[in-house]
């Protein structure tokens, strides 16, 4: 099936790329919900995540070393401008592997992927509709690679992340054997 065709070893098929986007969105939708829950509980609306929460792979650093580098990355994020972090995300110059929680599930059906892709924007709209009076600048999510982001910035990251993978799909499609 074309959806499952990966053009080379250690590359993703179009289906896997789409599934990764689904899983990534679900992770961040849960993070946004957690921030809204903090507000409802009267707590500070700040989530600080660590490498151990996501277990990503960055550069050529072993995954097992990343939890020990949380503080180092925090310091880098204090001085690295957001525009440069965005450039690194969009350019794919910094090699990363998907975190375990967003690693695609091979062999999913096209129907299942389509249904989940269609459900994502609705789920996100429902999340924000539940907080009509909220100041989204006041909800802060910290990620060791992305630094501190309010909800507007987090949504911009999700858009940029999707753009990267749309390009990946565009690169993959011509390589599919028909």
Name each region found by the language model.
Residues 4-55, 72-96, 118-178:
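Short, contiguous alpha-helical
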Residues 113-116:
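A short, structured beta-strand-centered segment in the mid-to-C-terminal lobe
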Residues 58-64:
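Basic helix-extension-helix modules of the SAP/HeH family
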Residues 99:
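Residues forming anionic-ligand binding surfaces in small-molecule and nucleic-acid pockets
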């Amino acid at each position: 099936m074309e959806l499952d065709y990966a053009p080379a070893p250690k590359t993703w098929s179009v289906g896997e790329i789409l599934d990764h986007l689904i899983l990534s969105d679900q992770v961040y939708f849960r993070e946004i919900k957690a921030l809204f829950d903090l507000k409802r509980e009267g707590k500070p609306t700040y989530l600080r995540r660590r490498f151990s929460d996501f277990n990503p792979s960055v550069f050529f650093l072993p995954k097992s070393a990343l939890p020990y580098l949380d503080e180092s990355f925090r310091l880098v994020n204090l001085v690295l401008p957001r525009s440069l972090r965005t450039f690194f995300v969009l350019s794919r110059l910094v090699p990363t592997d998907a975190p375990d929680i967003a690693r695609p599930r091979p062999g999913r059906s096209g129907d299942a992927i389509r249904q989940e892709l269609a459900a994502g924007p609705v789920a996100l709209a429902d999340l924000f509709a539940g907080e009509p009076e909220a100041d989204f600048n006041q909800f802060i999510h910290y990620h060791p690679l992305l630094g501190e982001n309010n909800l507007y910035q987090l949504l911009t990251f999700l858009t940029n992340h999707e753009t990267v993978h749309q390009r990946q799909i565009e690169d993959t499609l011509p390589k599919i054997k028909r």
